[in-house]
Amino acid sequence: MRVLILLLMLLLPGLSQAQPGDDLFAPRGATQTDFLPVEKAFRFTWERLDDGQVQLRWQIAPGYYLYQKRLRFDGLDPALQPQLPPGESHSDEFFGESQVYRQSLELTLPAAAAGQLRLGWQGCADAGLCYPPQSQALDLGGTGPAAAGTSGEVAEDQGLAGSLQAGNLAWSLLLFFGLGLLLAFAPCSLPMLPILAGLVVGSGAGPRRGLLLAGSYVLSMALVYAGLGVVAALLGGNLQAWLQQPWLLGSFAALFVFLALPMFGFFELQLPAALRDRLDGLSRGRKGGSLAGAAALGALSGLLVGPCMTAPLAGALLYIAQTGNALHGGLVLFSLGLGIGMPLLLLVTVGSRFLPKPGPWMNLVKGVFGFLFLGTAWILLRPLLGEALWIGLGGALLLVLAYAALHTARGLARHAVLFGAAGCIFGLWGAAMLLGAAAGADDPWRPLQVYAAANRGATPTASAHEAFLTVSQPAELDRQLAAAKAEGQWVLLDYYADWCVSCRIMEKQVFAKPDVLAALQGVRLLRLDVTADNAASRELLHRYQVPGPPSLIWIGPEGEERRARRLTGEVDAGGFLAHWQATRERG
């Protein structure tokens, strides 16, 4: 069996570089000029002065300029419109001869200005990039005309961000701890369970030591999760994309393969003798794994296999980005991380009490967790491999697991039937995955569906690909939105990335459904591809203040976003159809 496992693991380095069509370790979407994010190119601030007037100020970075004719003040009484100062003449490929502002722009609204105001502006860079139109809602207080597209309804992420602003810290921490408990059972959080269980069981730690190890893992995971969330929100960067770079995922997949080797008895993973003796002296007889090692593994889990983009996470990030209150937002994210880790901690520590006392069976358990480590590496490799290649690798892993289970069953007096049945199931499933991979399957749960689809003459995902127009540049998005507005069309913006597992699931289980495609007839479907971590992707994300994919945004026939109807995170077909019907009815 060791030979089979070794051969399987030797495939991983080559497969991790097998992404078709490009160099795996080449930076994606690299450009010759890296432009400033729009919020840094045009820094906007406003304040109400002592005399009641409202001062609006744009600080414009060198090499950038704002268009005079692109300034908008929606919701402001025409009699209160500000007097625009003269600009400098400028001619470019985007708007021809125009008046533009450089360095700074200050405007003053009279004291009578009140209510909801939506500002709009647009600028470009001398180096050749034209940013998409920007907008910001201002609450000037008092009463006044409502800005277009506003209502009392808010999206889930907005509601959570609002609760953070309105509520006290203790309530916010409790709320997000509870949300974390729910997120612990999301599919993208489940890979953390075998990592933590393998750590505790593989160390042979007792109940108390196991609790300390699990606590160290969960605590460090929550700390890293909170820290990265705060950094991402304050810097406005696409941190998800950075953490999903091929070299990083490939490195950590190799690390989990390396961690699996000791579980199969290839070697014993331990510190150098001198350092080990010193630590043994300091620990004074404590048995079990290293707390520092558990903390390091927890940090890696927070980086790579933590929860995906969901409404609670988006709400916390939106709150930090809007208020700049990194301390409050960081504590909330830390509480969310603790909530995610709590069920894992209970399953590993409390569940371990029902296991028999240490003995020869531990070698069997270590082998099980070795396969779980290999499965984690397989999951990490998904964004790097084509779907068929990834499914084929999973099928090979299942066949090796089936052989191991059947081989183990022959040497057991008890539970032989259980292991034999498991081996047969794994073997059949692995064979099905290999057969499906040979035909180009893209769903590991239904690997043979590709043959049924071929008999019908089409694949389910082909219709989904054809229905959506992929957009990766802000200028193309502007053209599509303008065309939809001219035709009075609804628009669905689907933020997507190749490394986003939830995006792929929704592509197959939502947008490939005939009833979903039928319901979306007449809607302009745009897939905003933010796979690459470059200026264009950052602009697409910042356009609607989206923290990351998957996110679904509805644009009405008049060109305004229905912000309260935004969907963040994974949704099933039934939920999506109900949501779209309600959105269409409300207009």
UniProtKB/Swiss-Prot annotation:
Membrane topology: Multi-pass membrane protein
This protein's GO CC annotations: plasma membrane
Catalytic activity: [protein]-dithiol + NAD(+) = [protein]-disulfide + NADH + H(+); [protein]-dithiol + NADP(+) = [protein]-disulfide + NADPH + H(+)
SS bonds (residue pairs): C124-C130, C188-C308, C500-C503
Entry EC no(s): 1.8.1.8
Cytoplasmic side: 194-216, 268-299, 352-360, 405-416
Pfam families recorded: DsbD_N, DsbD_TM, Thioredoxin_7
Residue intervals annotated with topology Periplasmic: 19-172, 238-246, 321-330, 382-383, 438-587
GO terms (BP aspect): cell redox homeostasis; cytochrome complex assembly
Family annotation (SUPFAM superfamilies): Thiol:disulfide interchange protein DsbD, N-terminal domain (DsbD-alpha) (SSF74863), Thioredoxin-like (SSF52833)
Bilayer-crossing regions: 173-193, 217-237, 247-267, 300-320, 331-351, 361-381, 384-404, 417-437
Signal peptide: 1-18
Keywords assigned: Cell inner membrane, Cell membrane, Cytochrome c-type biogenesis, Disulfide bond, Electron transport, Membrane, NAD, Oxidoreductase, Redox-active center, Signal, Transmembrane, Transmembrane helix, Transport
Residues in Thioredoxin domain copies: 448-585
Subcellular compartments: Cell inner membrane
GO molecular function, one term: protein-disulfide reductase activity
Transmembrane helix in keyword set: yes
Protein family membership: Belongs to the thioredoxin family. DsbD subfamily.
Alphabetized PANTHER family for the sequence: THIOL:DISULFIDE INTERCHANGE PROTEIN DSBD
Its job: Required to facilitate the formation of correct disulfide bonds in some periplasmic proteins and for the assembly of the periplasmic c-type cytochromes. Acts by transferring electrons from cytoplasmic thioredoxin to the periplasm. This transfer involves a cascade of disulfide bond formation and reduction steps.
Name this protein carries in UniProt: Thiol:disulfide interchange protein DsbD 2
Organism encoding this protein: Pseudomonas aeruginosa (strain ATCC 15692 / DSM 22644 / CIP 104116 / JCM 14847 / LMG 12228 / 1C / PRS 101 / PAO1)
